[in-house]
C-alpha cells in the first residue's frame, strides 16, 4: 500500500485524530456485537503506547432528524472501550463540537483517550457529516495536531467530513492497522492472487453484485454463485423458479453475464425449497435446478455443495461474499456451512470473507478463526472487489 501508515509518524505528545468504525448494534443500551470495537484496539493501543493523545470519531446508525438521536449515542461504546482498554475514556454525551469539547481535548495528557459523540448527530442540521461539509471537516481537524489516522474501513467508500473532510485539513493523513490489513488482504487477493483464485458470491440480489461479478470474471479462475440471486440467473435461462426471489429487470444482465463468462460462472444444480419463506409446512430438495410450483428456493442443495466443493479443490485464493441461503434459519444453513467447510479444508489457502452477512455467518456458525481474514466492511469490501477506488483511502497521504 503506497500510503503512509500510523507507524510512519511521530505520535508522542500529539493530539491524534482517529476515525474508527464503532457502528455496532446496540439494543436497549447494550452492545450485542462488539467485533468492530475489538478490531480497532490495535491502532488505539499503539497510539496510546507511543504517548499520543487519541481523539476518536465514529458514527452509529443513521441520524436524519432530532428524534433519530434516541438510542444512537456512543455512550455505551465509550463504556465498553474503557473496559477493553482498562482506562478511562473521556466522553461528553450529545456533544460533537464547541467549547466543552475543545476544553476536554486540550486537557488530555499523553496516553489518554477521548471519544467524540456520534458524528452523524451533525446530520440533523443539513447532513454536515454525510455530505462532507467543508467547515465541519476543518473544525474537527483543528482539534488535533496535524495527524489523522483512518482506521475505519467500513466507511472508506464514503466521502464524509469525519474521514475525507479531516484528511483534507491535516498535514498527514495515515492508515491505521485495520485499514492497512483490509486493503492488503482484499486488494492483494483480487489484483495479485495466488492461483487458482475462486470467488464465491451469494446474497439475494444480482443488482447489488453486477460490478463485482464483472470484475471478478476478469480476475478469478472461477466464480461460484449461490443465494437468492441464483434464481434470477435460472430464470434468465428459462428454468422454472416457482415463487423464488427474482429480479425481473435484471434477467438480461444475468443472461449477458452467463454468455460472456466463458464457463467461469458456476451455478447451483439443486436447491432446498419450501412452500413459504417463514410459516412453511413442507421443505424438500429439488431433483435438479427447477423449483416446484408453489415453492421457493431458500438454500443450495447437496448436489450443489458437492459441485462447489469440487470447484474449490486446490484453490490457493478464495474470496467469499454473501451466504448460500437463509443461514439464520437452521433449516437453510447447510449450503453456507458446506461451502465454508470446502474453503477451509484447502491446504495453504488464503481465504477472505468480504464482510456483511458472510462475516455474520462465519462468526455465528463458529468458523471465524478458520479464515485468513474477515472484513469489517460490507459496502467498502464490495467496492474493492469491484475494483473501485475508495474515497477514504484516496484521501490519505502518499508515502
Curated annotation (Swiss-Prot):
One of its GO terms (cellular component) is cytosol. InterPro entries: Phosphoglycerate_kinase, Phosphoglycerate_kinase_CS, Phosphoglycerate_kinase_N, Phosphoglycerate_kinase_sf. It catalyses: (2R)-3-phosphoglycerate + ATP = (2R)-3-phospho-glyceroyl phosphate + ADP. Disulfide bonds: none annotated. One of its GO terms (biological process) is glycolytic process. Pfam families: PGK. Its EC number is 2.7.2.3. Substrate binds at residues 21-23, 36, 59-62, 120, 158. The keyword ATP-binding applies. Pathway: Carbohydrate degradation; glycolysis; pyruvate from D-glyceraldehyde 3-phosphate: step 2/5. PROSITE patterns: PGLYCERATE_KINASE. Belongs to the phosphoglycerate kinase family. PANTHER family: PHOSPHOGLYCERATE KINASE, PHOSPHOGLYCERATE KINASE 1, CHLOROPLASTIC-RELATED. Monomer. This is Phosphoglycerate kinase. It comes from Streptococcus thermophilus (strain ATCC BAA-491 / LMD-9).
Amino acid at each position: 500500500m503506497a500510503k503512509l501508515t500510523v507507524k510512519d509518524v511521530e505520535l508522542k505528545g500529539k493530539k491524534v485524530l482517529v476515525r474508527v468504525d464503532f457502528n455496532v448494534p446496540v439494543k436497549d443500551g447494550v452492545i450485542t456485537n462488539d467485533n468492530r470495537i475489538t478490531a480497532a484496539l490495535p491502532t488505539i493501543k499503539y497510539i496510546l503506547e507511543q504517548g499520543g493523545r487519541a481523539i476518536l470519531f465514529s458514527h452509529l446508525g443513521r441520524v436524519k432528524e432530532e428524534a433519530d438521536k434516541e438510542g444512537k449515542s456512543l455512550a455505551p461504546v465509550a463504556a465498553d472501550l474503557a473496559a477493553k482498554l482498562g482506562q478511562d475514556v473521556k466522553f461528553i454525551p450529545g456533544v460533537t463540537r464547541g467549547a466543552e469539547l475543545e476544553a476536554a481535548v486540550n486537557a488530555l495528557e499523553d496516553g489518554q483517550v477521548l471519544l467524540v459523540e456520534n458524528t452523524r448527530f451533525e446530520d440533523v442540521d443539513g447532513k454536515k457529516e454525510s455530505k462532507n461539509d467543508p467547515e465541519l471537516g476543518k473544525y474537527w481537524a483543528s482539534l488535533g495536531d496535524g495527524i489523522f489516522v483512518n482506521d475505519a474501513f467500513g466507511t472508506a467508500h464514503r466521502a464524509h467530513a469525519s474521514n475525507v473532510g479531516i484528511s483534507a485539513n491535516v498535514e498527514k493523513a495515515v492508515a491505521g492497522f485495520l485499514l492497512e490489513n483490509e486493503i492488503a488482504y482484499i486488494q492483494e487477493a483480487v489484483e495479485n492472487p495466488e492461483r487458482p483464485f475462486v470467488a464465491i458470491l451469494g446474497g439475494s440480489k444480482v443488482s447489488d453484485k453486477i460490478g463485482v461479478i464483472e470484475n471478478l470474471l476478469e480476475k478469478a479462475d472461477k466464480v461460484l454463485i449461490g443465494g437468492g440471486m441464483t434464481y434470477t440467473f435460472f430464470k434468465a435461462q428459462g428454468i422454472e423458479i416457482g415463487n423464488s426471489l427474482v429480479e425481473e429487470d435484471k434477467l438480461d444482465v444475468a443472461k449477458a453475464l452467463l454468455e460472456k463468462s466463458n464457463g467461469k460462472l458456476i451455478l447451483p444444480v439443486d436447491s432446498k425449497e419450501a412452500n413459504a419463506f417463514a410459516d412453511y409446512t413442507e421443505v424438500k430438495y429439488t431433483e435438479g435446478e427447477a423449483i416446484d410450483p408453489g415453492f421457493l428456493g431458500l438454500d443450495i442443495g447437496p448436489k450443489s455443495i458437492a459441485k462447489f466443493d469440487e470447484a474449490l479443490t486446490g484453490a490457493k485464493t478464495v474470496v467469499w461474499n454473501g451466504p448460500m441461503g437463509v443461514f439464520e434459519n437452521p433449516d437453510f444453513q447447510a449450503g453456507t456451512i458446506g461451502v465454508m467447510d470446502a474453503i477451509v479444508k484447502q491446504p495453504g489457502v488464503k481465504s477472505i470473507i468480504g464482510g456483511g452477512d458472510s462475516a455474520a455467518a462465519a462468526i455465528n456458525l463458529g468458523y471465524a478463526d478458520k479464515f485468513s481474514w474477515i472484513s469489517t466492511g460490507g459496502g467498502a469490501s464490495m467496492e474493492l472487489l469491484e475494483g473501485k477506488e475508495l474515497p477514504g483511502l484516496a484521501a490519505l497521504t502518499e508515502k
